Amino acid sequence: MKRERGRRGRKRVCSFCVDKATSIDYKETSKLRKYVTERGKILPRRISGNCAHHQRMLTTAIKRSRNIALLPFSTEA
């Protein structure tokens, strides 16, 4: 008896590659908020669907916007 392991969903496509973005601006908080959870954590690649190159750029952009208080580090609970 063969047992099915896990469920593989459809691979998500990097939204930045589709838009042919060369850089990710840290001042565009509306775009960055899509990749941050409500607890303030950055979504991983396997969930967001970004490629490795754009995930690194996204991480630095989120960290920069946190440092100048455009995005919160965490939510007040």
Swiss-Prot record:
Pfam families: Ribosomal_S18 (PF01084). GO terms for molecular function: small ribosomal subunit rRNA binding; structural constituent of ribosome. It comes from the Bacteria. Keywords: Ribonucleoprotein, Ribosomal protein, RNA-binding, rRNA-binding. InterPro entries: Ribosomal_bS18, Ribosomal_bS18_CS, Ribosomal_bS18_sf. GO terms for biological process: translation. The keyword Ribonucleoprotein applies. Disulfide bonds: none annotated. GO terms for cellular component: cytosolic small ribosomal subunit. PROSITE patterns: RIBOSOMAL_S18. Belongs to the bacterial ribosomal protein bS18 family. PANTHER family: 30S RIBOSOMAL PROTEIN S18, SMALL RIBOSOMAL SUBUNIT PROTEIN BS18M. Binds as a heterodimer with protein bS6 to the central domain of the 16S rRNA, where it helps stabilize the platform of the 30S subunit. Part of the 30S ribosomal subunit. Forms a tight heterodimer with protein bS6. This is Small ribosomal subunit protein bS18. It comes from Desulforamulus reducens (strain ATCC BAA-1160 / DSM 100696 / MI-1) (Desulfotomaculum reducens). The gene is rpsR.
